[in-house]
């Protein structure tokens, strides 16, 4: 499988996440001096609440983004987790991360023999309930409050709709006819899914490779068509060199055991 990644987008999002968390923290700390002045200057009460609310929102947003764009052995970044799970696919599959299409960045898309699959990922841990294109978190209000700085659910169906629309517009402008579909993939196996009649396939990360292999094309894509899609969709601010993931296991070479020689010169 070939991989194209806009590492420049990753670096920029990391910087934005750190700055958001930093300035959010400063706003939160800035409320304390105003609190001590409340008694002498009551008009500062409103300013204190504005700083507190703004700092809380900005700090939690920054922490969410830091978690999203960090990469550790226990918590791989979304694009790297997809790479690891789909690495056994042959070279006719091309995984593009953070493709800049017009004004929108499509985080993950897979060019496969039958077309293009938009992969919308979520690292959400709790219980996710979906009815067609409507998503909500199930849980107590206090649990939601403490989870504000962690991975969020949002509406992955809407995000997939927007990504598909951007890709279809780019294909139309380039006069390319390719089927585009979407899949919603949850990265954390601890998530609880309650899904009924979703607009797109919803699955855990472990099931993604099997789903991709099941997408049998009516007319397989030619190499020229595939490269035209790569030229159109594989754009970004700082692209990594295209990588090819190995699809075969290395062949183990058996070593010969050295022969032992007896005292009369004959091999044992």
Question: Language-model segments: which ranges?
Answer:
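Surface-exposed interaction regions that form or flank ligand-binding interfaces
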Residues: 1-104, 111-112, 116, 125-130, ...
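Accessory nucleic-acid engagement/destabilization modules that flank
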Residues: 130-138
